[in-house]
Design a protein with these regions (language model features):
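Residue-level marker of positions within ordered structural domains that often coincide
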Residues: 53, 157, 188, 256, ...
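Glycine-rich loops and low-complexity Gly/Arg-rich segments
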Residues: 71-75, 113, 159-161, 170-173, ...
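C-terminal cap/substrate-recognition subdomain and adjoining C-terminal extension
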Residues: 1-6, 21, 205-344
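Intrinsically disordered, serine/threonine/proline
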Residues: 1-134, 138, 329-344
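Alpha-helical substrate-recognition element adjacent to the catalytic core
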Residues: 2-31, 37-40, 47, 82, ...
Length: 344
């Protein structure tokens, strides 16, 4: 049985060590990138990343242009600082932690007494850099929550087409990205009618795109929530990460961390969301309220997988949680109302 990490991961680790030394000599400085987390009365999941970034400051005009016309490639500036030491401060409690080989911090810490609601935690790097992350503490009495995909569910990317995926990720300005109609309004209505319920985004997108996604959500009125994204590059078992496995693991962790909640799973029919959600509903029936699938347009569907199964006669569905489909948020909201399983 092989115990050594995959060759690609070992090669990447060696290259990172060399590049880290070079970048430090060139004046690059440590930076902490915080991500939104979640927690309960017992534990808090804190997410962040330690990276090296150029220390050069832009002029006023350049900074304004960068702010107003951010392009995707700007989200990828920075180089991970592997195994970096850090600490997390929650109230009067400070906990030492260490980043993984990708510079990521993903830890669960005992809740020192934070009440349900939104709170701030501070992540401090070993070289003095720090950042504040938001965490939502979810009350023990909360029984409803929403899990949402991002690409082609709230944000139109035409992601499965390789050229457009690269264009959207690295070139397209953030202001040019399109929101799926009605999704923000639907999410707002559900969370307003069910105060304290979490909205958690689970996506195969890279954590590098987190700042862009947050700005997009704010601009289009999409409620704030934890984002469980992934990383690009080799793993300890292969050259590429499995997006399907990432989502499957994220759903299992949510069921474990928030056992009282039954989830409305929201995704699209462009890739694997219907199958993943059906599998989760079958294996964890106590944790799934319903499954909402946004139907891609014919053009999007062809780019996603070439064909589209229009009728449900041959589509398998678990009987434990209803599934409904519509092309936008307003249509999905109407169908959920007809099911009469939650109020909003």
């Amino acid at each position: 049985m092989r115990t050594r990490p995959f060759f690609g991961a070992r090669l990447e680790d060696r290259l990172k060590k060399v590049i880290n030394r070079v970048l430090k000599r060139r004046g690059w400085q440590e930076s902490v990138r915080p991500y939104t987390g979640y927690g309960t009365s017992e534990q808090i999941r804190v997410l962040a990343r330690i990276v090296l970034q150029p220390s050069k400051q832009f002029g006023i005009v350049q900074a304004a242009n960068a702010l107003l016309y951010r392009r995707g490639w700007r989200n990828f500036i920075g180089f991970s600082k592997a195994d970096a030491a850090a600490s997390i401060r929650i109230g009067n409690t400070t906990v030492p932690v260490r980043a993984d080989r990708g510079g990521y911090i993903d830890v669960r810490i005992k809740n020192p007494g934070l009440a349900p609601g939104w709170h701030s935690v501070t992540i401090q790097g070993s070289d003095g850099a720090s950042a504040v992350a938001s965490v939502q503490i979810i009350g023990d009495d909360i029984t409803f929550g929403v899990v949402s995909d991002i690409d082609d569910t709230i944000l139109s990317t035409w992601l499965p087409r390789p050229f457009l995926a690269a264009w959207n990720s690295f070139v397209l300005t953030e202001q040019a990205r399109q929101a799926i109609p009605g999704m923000a309004r639907w999410y707002q209505q559900m969370l307003e009618a069910n105060p304290g319920s979490p909205l958690i985004f689970v996506s195969t997108g890279a954590f590098n795109t987190y700042p862009m996604i947050r700005r997009f959500q704010k601009r289009h009125g999409i409620p704030h929530g934890a984002m469980l994204l992934t990383d690009w590059g080799p793993t300890n078992t292969g050259w590429f990460r499995s997006g399907t496995d990432h989502k499957r693991t994220a759903l299992r962790e949510l069921a474990r961390d928030l056992p009282n909640i039954r989830w409305l799973l929201v995704g699209d029919d462009g890739q694997h969301d219907p199958e993943l959600y059906a599998e989760f509903a079958e294996l964890q029936p106590a944790h799934v309220l319903a499954r909402a699938i946004r139907e891609l347009s014919p053009g999007e569907a062809v780019l996603a997988h070439g064909i589209r199964l229009e009728d449900g006669e041959h589509r398998w569905n678990p009987t434990t949680a209803p599934e409904f489909r519509a092309p936008d948020g307003d249509g999905l909201a109407d169908k959920l109302r007809k099911l009469d399983i939650i109020s909003f």
